[in-house]
Amino acid sequence: MTMSNLHPGFILIAVGLIALFVPKSLRRPVLAAGPLLGLGAVLTLAPGTNATLPFINGITLHYLHVDALSWIFALIFCMMAAIGGIYACHNSNRMEAFCSMTYAGSALGVTLAQDWLTLIFFSELMAATSLFLIWCKKTPASRQAGYRYLLMHMFGGNLLLAGIFLKVSAGDYLVMPLAQGPWDTAFWLICLGISINAAVVPLHAWLVDAYPEGTVTGSVFLSSFTTKVAVYCLIRIFAGTDFLIWFGVLMALYGACYAIMENDMRRLLSYHIVSQVGFMVAGVGLGTAMALNGATAHAFSHILYKSLLFMCAGAIIYATGIRKINQLGGLAKKMPFTFWCFVIAALSISGVPLFNGFISKSITISAAAAAHYGSVELLLQLAGVGTFLSIALKMIYFIFLAPDNGVVIKREVPKNMYVAMGIGATLCVLYGVYPELLYRYLPFTMEPYHPFTVDHITQSIEMLGMAMLPFMMYLPKMAPHTALSLDTDWFYRKPFAGIVTGLSYLCCAVSRALGNTWEVLYEKSMELSHNPMEFLDAKPLRNSSKYNPENYRTSIADPIMITLTILFCSLCYFMAII
């Protein structure tokens, strides 16, 4: 393996392993400089680079495949790993350092995989390592949110795994587009599995539940990888699947509306992950070269400005210990650098001209107009208004500009966090002013796109003005307040809690009615468990002169179905009690 085909994901995983074992004095330079090696490896990868590994039964693992699409996602993932490493290098938690780098490396593993088995391996590694970024906070809320996160990703991972098994059993080992059909069982299983990772509404509640409970540094990584890896997979596998258009529009509006009602900083930002990923999913559904480039560009931009928003929120929580917006105020004077970085990130996510969100979001909206989806164009613009209202206006005013609530800066923010925030803010402005730095690497051929036309700029200013006027008119009513907002997880957590309670009462009633008979049934069932086929068969072959191991052998489908049934029941149970 030479530098020209060195897998950058392996480098990041190695950085994580080193950070796990070295003393704290060496961990800081490892986290700060290690990801730069991965970034260098990405820059040396040329389109067409491939690397394989022989596997069992003549199967070959294509663990490294580089084309224009995988390269640009690998680039931004390594850039984010480097920024996140700088932001987190003051952290003394070696497990968190290991999981964050391995998580980023696994995201690269999925991105550069060309076969289904490699993809599912790194996808599951992503789920496992991201879980510990939530649990590393070590609070009851993070532990419970982590369990719910685990159960949802077990469910989604098993759907994806089942679909991949169907593809592999049919001899389809390589990751190929599925949108053109057939829309068979494998298609739907893989689509559902990826949709859970993409937080497609109504399968999104795990994200808003878990990401705010991560550590200050861990949430920065969480906001950057899982959903964007899912977007990459959707572009690669399901481009042009038209029903995704409307799911994307629903996500964009749903996330923006719920964000307006939120009082918790990181929950609000998490809802906007759902909203912004909706733009990408809609672009995937449109399926044109322009729309797919828009989805790719917006994923690139989103990672930069969303991570910057989470870094700023993390700095506020680190300094003050406060997460609720209504408990903050007057921080512009107390944390001026954080304030200006937040302003840049807020203007970027709102799609204000000269910031990177504008040069990417406008491509998807223009693609919808070009494809004659006028309603999609309008609804996505309305979602942009909601974004500007809840982040650029609500968060900036009530956190930084509102009268001081007596917030005390309990500890100084480490300099490395400021450095990472400064890098993120610089990139948001740089790509916004010079969009060709991004456009030249977009993977699909399309007509030259110029974002800074009079029409685009005027339309953007008009839409943002629509949000500013009502905010100023109804400022007292826009003040955040503590309230319970029910999300889609209520529909499975509340009913299943009743089901679990009812089943518990039923089991107790049956146990009391049976009395000693219950013990007899238990003993018989234990005897039966040693040879369940003896119960299913009318008469075993007792007189057979020779032992035949095939007598009681059942199809492999039976234990698989039993296992999946147990997993599903366990999922329902734990969702109800957690």
Describe the residue ranges of each PLM region.
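Membrane-interface helix termini and inter-helical loops of multi-pass transporters
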Residues: 50-64, 170-180, 235-237, 361-368, ...
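Transmembrane helix-loop-helix hairpins at membrane boundaries of multipass inner-membrane proteins
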Residues: 1-98, 172-173, 177-178, 494-497
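Hydrophobic transmembrane alpha-helices and their helix-loop junctions in integral membrane proteins
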Residues: 83-119, 128-413, 433
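Aromatic-capped, Gly/Pro-kinked transmembrane alpha-helices
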Residues: 440-454, 478-578
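Alpha-helical transmembrane segments and their helix-start/interface "positive-inside/aromatic belt" motifs
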Residues: 24-35, 144-151, 333-341, 411-423, ...
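Short aromatic-rich membrane-water interface segments that cap or initiate transmembrane helices
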Residues: 57-73, 180-187, 367-380, 449-456
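Alpha-helical transmembrane segments and their membrane-interface junctions
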Residues: 348-363, 425-446, 517-524, 570-576
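Hard-cation-handling environments
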Residues: 411-466
